[in-house]
Amino acid sequence: MAVMIRSPGRQRSLLMLGDLIVVLLTTVTGFANHGELASAGLSRMAATFVPFAFAWFVVSPWLGCFEPERVTRLTDLWRPPLAALLAAPLGAIVRGLWLGAPVIPAFAVVMGAVVAAAMFAWRLVAVSVIRHVAGAGG
């Protein structure tokens, strides 16, 4: 594993993949919590996942969420949750356009908060792993 995440490019790839998984799991969990997991179908879930993933990758680089000197500092762990909160309105707007439906502000707030919390947890794990690998000879 150490060889895989030593370089900044590989760290960035790991973070991006993990971020996508966080948005995907948040989407699936949301459908499950609303009792719609079985009935929703892939296209309906994609109509939530894709816009919020898109919004995440539009907003997060502006807050330095993938900069090598920032992703390993615990003092910079505020960046991904803030990026998630700022990306949520854009994700909700893109989702509304995709579905041809009104944008529900409460949905954007809840999705932003849940993704922010999940992103914080994931990035805390990622920082620990990256720092451990770097300390082990990376």
Protein language model regions, located:
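Signature of alpha-helical transmembrane segments in polytopic membrane proteins
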Residues: A2-G138
